[in-house]
Amino acid sequence: MNDIEIADLYQELIVDHSRRPRNYRRLENATRQAEGFNPLCGDKVKVYVDLENDVVRDISFEGEGCAISKASASLMTETIKGKSKAEVEQLFSRFRHLATGTGDGSGLGKLAVFSVLRGFPARVKCATLVWHTLHAALEQTANIVSTE
């Protein structure tokens, strides 16, 4: 896929997932949760995870934010359902490297469209906030995560 095709797909996915986010709800039976905040953009997100035997049975999110953060959260929740904790951590690492320009989109599926953010550090924080929040929820390392 060339850069123009990726940019077109990015636009389409961001608009779709920000207007109609998937898994945007409070997960009542969550076994893990964490909150994230991006002071630069004002994004706030809460991630809920139902983790059983180290497998993500269900995941959801709530929050306010820009189109990029909401779309990233929506796409992330679709991508990681049914994945093991180890697989999720690998996806998080790949996504972070993709968004910051140190990796490619292999193995990321639709998430690869976020490669267009490489030249925009503030937007990278919008896209990765939910991933850092998920990591904190899975590892139970912090209740509130900040991009700063």
Language-model features: locations:
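Alpha-helical support elements that line or immediately flank enzyme active sites
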Residues: S72-S84
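Short, thiol/selenol-centered motifs that function as redox-active sites or metal-ligating centers
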Residues: G63-A71
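Structured beta-strand/loop patches that form or line metal/cofactor-binding pockets in enzymes
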Residues: R20-G63
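Contiguous, function-dense segments enriched for cysteine-driven chemistry
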Residues: P39-D50, V55, A67, H97-L98, ...
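C-terminal binding/interaction regions
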Residues: M1-R25, K83-E148
